[in-house]
């Protein structure tokens, strides 16, 4: 009997230990991530200080949000809502989902705000250059001249009541590459908040949104990319919480021809890449859709006009890095910006 009692005790102990291990595994909080490739980029979403069971439920839904937006706003998918709008340019209005209507409406707002430096009707130009793809090339001057009249956000007609989009001219083509990721990041952040997630990192191909605190319960330290082509290290970092950080730089995608670099940020007014003294512009904002639209357009405005424009927009800050290694930051970042590379130096705005 004593022997049987010992065996029973050992079995009971093992059951309790197993239950404890399983319980710790199920209820222990940690960081769980998911990676995918949509919107022409690598996306990674990390949920912090969360139970695995909850992460397993939420991450597939996050993946679906990104996939749905990709299917609505992709230029490459013939059946996307964006492709349908473009195919019907000059023909008829197209009824669209709330998501793409809201993105286009916001795009037109930023086109007006920046006097056309940001223009989603830039599609004929981006298709001509195709920078970032295998068949990228430098178009002839006549080719650019022929498509420039089609690049005009003022020819986008929105009917809010009917939820329709109409492009007035045949050959017009919208390209949402400069704003779709920002919209997507905001939608993911909203979904996570509504489902009880307090801390997370959303990284959509460099469009970063940080929610709450990091795994040490502190503000996130987000690195600012060094624009130098031979560098993989950040040149600075900023400490932020519940913010979007979006950078547009000439180092991201470019075409090199006959020793000349042509970066991917095209001026909708000239048809050629923006030409100024900036290497990159980083926008820090509450909403990622704002940062996405502003990063390119503020770059296009150049240092002086861009800096003044940012100062006039409430709740938005920026980091400007010039080609001569000067760094300008707006007032809202002065207490949480750290320079890491002595090649660069902070300059005071006049």
Task: List the model feature ranges, each with a label.
Residues 2-350:
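Mature catalytic core of soluble alpha/beta enzymes
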């Amino acid at each position: 009997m004593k022997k049987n009692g010992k065996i029973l005790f050992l079995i009971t102990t093992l059951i309790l230990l197993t239950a404890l291990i399983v319980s710790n595994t199920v209820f222990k909080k940690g960081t769980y991530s998911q990676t995918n490739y949509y919107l022409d980029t690598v996306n990674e979403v990390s949920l912090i200080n969360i139970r695995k069971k909850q992460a397993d439920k939420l991450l597939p839904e996050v993946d679906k949000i990104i996939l749905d937006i990709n299917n609505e706003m992709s230029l490459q998918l013939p059946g996307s809502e964006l492709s349908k709008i473009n195919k019907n340019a000059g023909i008829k209005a197209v009824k669209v989902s709330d998501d793409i209507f809201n993105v286009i409406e916001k795009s037109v707002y930023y086109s007006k705000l920046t006097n056309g430096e940001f223009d989603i009707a830039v599609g004929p130009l981006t298709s001509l250059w195709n920078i970032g793809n295998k068949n990228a090339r430098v178009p002839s001057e006549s080719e650019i001249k022929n498509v420039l009249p089609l690049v005009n956000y003022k020819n986008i007609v929105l009917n809010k009541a009917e939820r329709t989009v109409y492009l007035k001219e045949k050959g017009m083509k919208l390209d949402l590459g400069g704003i779709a990721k920002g919209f997507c990041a905001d939608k993911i952040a909203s979904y996570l908040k509504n489902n009880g997630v307090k801390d997370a990192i959303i990284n959509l191909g460099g469009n970063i949104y940080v929610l709450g605190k990091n795994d040490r319960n502190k503000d996130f330290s987000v690195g600012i990319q060094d624009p130098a082509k031979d560098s993989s290290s950040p040149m600075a970092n900023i400490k932020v919480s519940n913010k979007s950080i979006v950078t547009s730089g000439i180092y991201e995608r470019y075409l090199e021809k006959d020793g000349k670099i042509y970066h991917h940020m095209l001026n909708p007014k000239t048809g050629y890449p923006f030409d100024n003294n900036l290497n990159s512009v980083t926008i820090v904002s509450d909403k990622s859709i704002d940062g996405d639209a502003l990063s390119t357009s503020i770059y296009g405005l150049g240092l002086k006009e861009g800096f003044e424009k940012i100062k006039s927009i409430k709740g938005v800050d920026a980091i400007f890095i010039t080609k001569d290694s000067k760094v300008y930051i707006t007032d809202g970042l002065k207490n949480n910006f750290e320079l890491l590379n002595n090649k660069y130096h902070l300059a005071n705005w006049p």
